[in-house]
Amino acid sequence: MADRYINPKVTTVSTGIPGRHIWSARHNHVVIDDSAAHDGPGDAPGAGELFLAGITGCATLMMERLARSSKAPLKRVEVSMEGLIDTEAKREGPAVFESARLKFVMVGVNDTQAREMVETYKRR
């Protein structure tokens, strides 16, 4: 049986290169760059992309868990996400997403099963 509580931990550190940081979780490391528009290197994924990646990663894992628990014949799931940030919006603090859209593609389940799994995801 799974533990009741999990406690994910991450750390991000600057590298001495303006706009470049290293994000770490356990023994895994990812380079994060600020965009060239903000004077960063712009080569590695940015914080907004990693934020969206966290959401899509959670969604794919949950679809697999839901399929296993309901014995649905899910063979593959792909979740993509895009967001819109207005860099010229007049507000205090950092830029925020104006909107974001998730797209689910599932193979092996019928449309009804796929819709039910997505609705369950949206409620959690």
What do these predicted ranges mean?
Residues 1-53, 65-124:
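Extended beta-strand/beta-hairpin segments
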